[in-house]
Curated annotation (Swiss-Prot):
It comes from the Bacteria. It is an enzyme of class 4 (lyase). CDD domains: Tryptophan_synthase_alpha. HAMAP family: Trp_synth_alpha. It catalyses: (1S,2R)-1-C-(indol-3-yl)glycerol 3-phosphate + L-serine = D-glyceraldehyde 3-phosphate + L-tryptophan + H2O. This is Tryptophan synthase alpha chain. It holds the Pfam family Trp_syntA. The active site is at E53 (proton acceptor), D64 (proton acceptor).
Amino acid sequence: MTTTDRIAAAFARVSEAGRAAALIPYIAAGDPSPQATVPLMHALVRAGADLVELGVPFSDPMADGPVVQRAAERAIAQGVGLRRVLELVADFRRDDSVTPVVLMGYANPIERMGQRAFAQAAQAAGVDGVLVVDYPPEEVDEFAAMLAEAGVAPIFLLAPTSTEARIEAIGRVARGYVYYVSLKGVTGAGSLDTDDVARKLALIRRHVHIPVGVGFGIRDAASAQRIAAHADAVVIGSKLIETMEQTGAQAGADQKNEAAIAAAQQWLHTIRLALDDVKRENAPA
């Protein structure tokens, strides 16, 4: 199965099972440690993740709130950069050839590696999609084409402030799915206005004909359920990382990784169970 096929297949499985929305957890590669990342990814899949977003640590993460920033800092302090992240994905692929993995990060590490070299390395590692926070779609046609040529989906962000023209532009180049940022500001901030999200998704779907995931501001089962009634996927990161961070801080040094992984799996499973109860509000009767 090729990389872009894995994303389509994941959403198809969700639909065939009659579920309202896919569950996409976000974690920072290398947090709580590089050694824990692959076991953590497998644990998230066991908990019910349909896809996994893997953050590439970067020293100036402008879109990330304090929780995700701390996770990136912990990973960087342990020597995790883009090349190590690709190695971790390849390690994950040895035991899981089904679950899509999407890298989320910033342009600087990719530019240092070179866009074409990165696209080829991502494909070789088994990456399914790439979301670069600070690459505007109007300026990345060539990079998006390189990714697509390598079988890797170029994934883009949309925000509450996105104009219809920008939505239309993203609809032309995005593959896999589109990530709608439900709040203004950084990850982990603010509170959700579900009605506003529903209105924006209706506009997005006029121009975007692939799944639309929603993230930012989803912190518990109730907020995940509200979003799942409208979106094709629920993306959840800050609260998951915070749960691991708090649990790891309470554990002894030799138990920190295991405690964080167990807490993440247990917490995410509660979200998955909640999502399984949701019926899509705009689904046909």
